[in-house]
Structures are given as C-alpha cells and as structure tokens.
Amino acid sequence: MSEVPVARVWLVLLLLTVQVGVTAGAPWQCAPCSAEKLALCPPVSASCSEVTRSAGCGCCPMCALPLGAACGVATARCARGLSCRALPGEQQPLHALTRGQGACVQESDASAPHAAEAGSPESPESTEITEEELLDNFHLMAPSEEDHSILWDAISTYDGSKALHVTNIKKWKEPCRIELYRVVESLAKAQETSGEEISKFYLPNCNKNGFYHSRQCETSMDGEAGLCWCVYPWNGKRIPGSPEIRGDPNCQIYFNVQN
C-alpha cells in the first residue's frame, strides 16, 4: 500500500474539524456560551483586581493573570499591559502555549526583538525556520482586551507577515517542521474564507531537531480535551496498534514494541 503524504493526512483532519459558521467575515469565533454553561461558572474572587475571560473559548469570567504567571491558549488572559509569550529558550513555543506553559510578560518586552544569539549567524540563503521564529513572526501574544485567543492572533497575522522570507520549504529536511509550517499556512488561508469556524485543530508537536515527538494531540477550543495518538518520530505516521484517546496514550510502550 502506498504511503499517504503527511500534508494530505493533515488536510483530511482539518476538513473534518472545520464547520461552516453563520457569521460571514468572522471565521475564528468561539461557540456561543449557553445559559447552562454560564450557570456552572464559579464566582470570581472578590480580591481580583481585573476580571477577564479565558483566552480560549471558555465561557467563565476569570481573574486576569499577573506578571510572571503561567499562561496559554486555555488559561485566563494576562492583565492589561501584559502579553503571553513562550519562555526564553523554549524549544517548542507553539506547543508550549497550547499547553499553558507560557508566561505573562510586559508588552514592551514581548514586542522587543530578540537579542542576537551567540555564535555564527545563519546564511542569508538558508530557508530553515525554527518554531521560535514562527512564534516571533506570528506575534503569539494577546492583550487581555482582545476577543481572540493567543493562537488565533498568531494565525490572523500570519498572512500579512513579510518577515518570514521563506522561499522554498521543499529544501527543508525536517518533516515535522515542514508540516507545522503548512498547518499554520493552511489555517491562515482558511481564515480568508468567510463563514468558517474551527473549534479543533492539530499543531504538530516537533522536537528541537524538527522531527516528531511520539505523542501528538489535537488542540480543542470548545473546552473538551483533544484526542492524542502515537506516531513514529521520523515520519509522523501512526504507530499500528496504538490508541487514540483523550489523555496520555503511553506512546513509549507502543514505540518499544514496534522496535
């Protein structure tokens, strides 16, 4: 049986999770908050100095996060004047933010260009791009007054970003990094199509070398935990016999069995 290209597999997954919305021109909208959902919200502490809602599609008001607090797609928003960013040196910034492993920093610090790294600069002809560069160019940060989540801010600014200077991703050798770029590119293009509403999506979980972590999970914006599954690190294809569950599928067990 011939192998199905990874990009095609992702396209199928995206089509399965895209639903046609009813509001033209607003493709990145969360599902409406029903009275039942709002009734289940816990009260906000009286000591809270700034009330906001969660950064994802949660319905409950939350206390805005202070400077230095952990943050991400599904957490409360950072307080006014702060932005949620991946920690310095984070090898998987996009994935870290979907897991709530970012931190609230001053907006001035978040928008400042990174200091040059020690060592030799990359060749100007290089078409390599790291996940950290993706984070910087997609501006993965959201002030507390924004209506969209951190991740939607990233996707909405992607198409207009001219800082990537990517000329030919076919020259890239890292399969997960290639898929990550294509996923975000496809989501950005989907935003241009009015009426689309995405509540679940998949961002490849890449290691620092651009290959796949054995556990891959979808990200859910509807409050429900996303599905996780196991893949081979070198090509991202499902490990036969491994489960697809909402939780930890213990991929190392299945990986060891296959090897």
UniProtKB/Swiss-Prot annotation:
Matching PROSITE patterns: IGFBP_N_1 (PS00222), IGFBP_N_2 (PS51323), THYROGLOBULIN_1_1 (PS00484), THYROGLOBULIN_1_2 (PS51162)
Pfam families in the cross-refs: IGFBP, Thyroglobulin_1
Biological process per Gene Ontology, one example term: negative regulation of canonical Wnt signaling pathway
Post-translational modification: Phosphorylated; probably by casein kinase II. Phosphorylation alters the affinity of the protein for IGFs. In amniotic fluid, the unmodified protein is the most abundant form, while mono-, bi-, tri- and tetraphosphorylated forms are present in decreasing amounts. The phosphorylation state may influence the propensity to proteolysis.
GO terms under cellular component: endoplasmic reticulum lumen; extracellular region; extracellular space; Golgi apparatus
Gene Ontology molecular-function annotations: insulin-like growth factor binding; insulin-like growth factor I binding; insulin-like growth factor II binding; signaling receptor binding
Compartment(s) where it occurs, according to its Swiss-Prot or TrEMBL record: Secreted
InterPro entries: Growth_fac_rcpt_cys_sf, IGFBP-like, IGFBP1, IGFBP_1-6_chordata, Insulin_GF-bd_Cys-rich_CS, Thyroglobulin_1, Thyroglobulin_1_sf
Coiled coil: none
Endpoints of the signal sequence: 1-25
Motif, Cell attachment site: chain positions: 246-248
Classification via SUPFAM superfamilies: Growth factor receptor domain, Thyroglobulin type-1 domain
Domain of life from the UniProt record: Eukaryota
Keywords: Disulfide bond, Growth factor binding, Phosphoprotein, Secreted, Signal
Phosphoserine PTM sites in chain numbering: 45, 120, 123, 126, 144, 156, 194, 199, 242
Function text: Multifunctional protein that plays a critical role in regulating the availability of IGFs such as IGF1 and IGF2 to their receptors and thereby regulates IGF-mediated cellular processes including cell migration, proliferation, differentiation or apoptosis in a cell-type specific manner. Also plays a positive role in cell migration by interacting with integrin ITGA5:ITGB1 through its RGD motif. Mechanistically, binding to integrins leads to activation of focal adhesion kinase/PTK2 and stimulation of the mitogen-activated protein kinase (MAPK) pathway.
Protein name: Insulin-like growth factor-binding protein 1
Organism, as annotated: Homo sapiens
Lineage of the organism: Eukaryota, Metazoa, Chordata, Craniata, Vertebrata
